[in-house]
Amino acid sequence: MPVHAFSQPKGRLEFFQTDAHALLDNLLGDPTARTVGVYVPQACREGERYPLLIDLAGFTGSGLSHLAWKGFGETVPQRIDRLMMQGHLAPAVYVFPDCFTSLGGNQYVDSIAMGHWARWLHEVLVPGVEARYPVITEPGGRGLFGKSSGGYGALHQALHHGEHWGAVACHSGDMDFELCYGREFPEVLLALTQSGLSISGYIERLHRRRRIGGGEMHVLMTFAMAASYDPDPDAPFGVRLPVDLQTCERDDGRWAAWQSFDPIVGLERIAAQENLRGLKGLFLDCGLRDQYHLLYGARKFSARCEALNIEHEFETFDDTHSGIDYRMDRSLPWLVDKLA
């Protein structure tokens, strides 16, 4: 049984708001004003500047949820304090943005349906933190980390906007879309029979209910991926699927739009390769029993990086996709060491 963390964080935990209507305007009706949590450890001294690390939450999560009490576990600030007390982690400033959406989560890409979250991260969030906190203001002092959708978002930034970052850690991030998403479409269509194959009807029905079941959350997650990777500006909530709703036959054009966001595909771009080479560090890991089959994409991505002579750290561990926050014990010291 894990040991419960009873001690409260010893540093400063503060909050501020950003509002970037032009970037985060969306088809979901979600607010463009967002709350950002910031943790400044007690060891940070006045007059000095420290690495900036941004925590991108996984699907169904928010940076704010990483600050909340957890039974038989640690909040991320508690984890930071413990690692620092053990001498494993140097001081840095940590940022926890609320990027949750009405479709259940965020892939942190630019989408007319969900909002331009990729740009928001480096055009709005970073300057907002730099104006308020003692962080290194050069790209080489900034890092991103996340798990699952958050890991995907961190890697997406590295591939497409690497000039803004010094190091990135991706825990069990979405990649090889055929393996991790392809199997979901038949199940989604079965679920849609409850609403006469109406995507908007299904979403509206969920919004009227008091709770969402696990299977329904997976359907909503597929809708969120569709709104992220191939949004339809004329559809309710911006959602269209890359399959025929009657036969589940794949629409090659629509699926190609999805695949253009796959890190396996994105890595073939020369600009993406140069972005990764420009980083101080790239950390990837995945569980050997990941139930979403993300291990195979991670292995492919790492192997391709090796073939392209792109330096990176790739690790596997004996676990699933779930309950793996302990992997931050490995990635956070690694990131801060690269950025300091």
Question: Each predicted region: which residue ranges?
Answer:
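Non-catalytic cap/lid and distal C-terminal segments of serine-dependent acyl enzymes
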Residues: 1-340
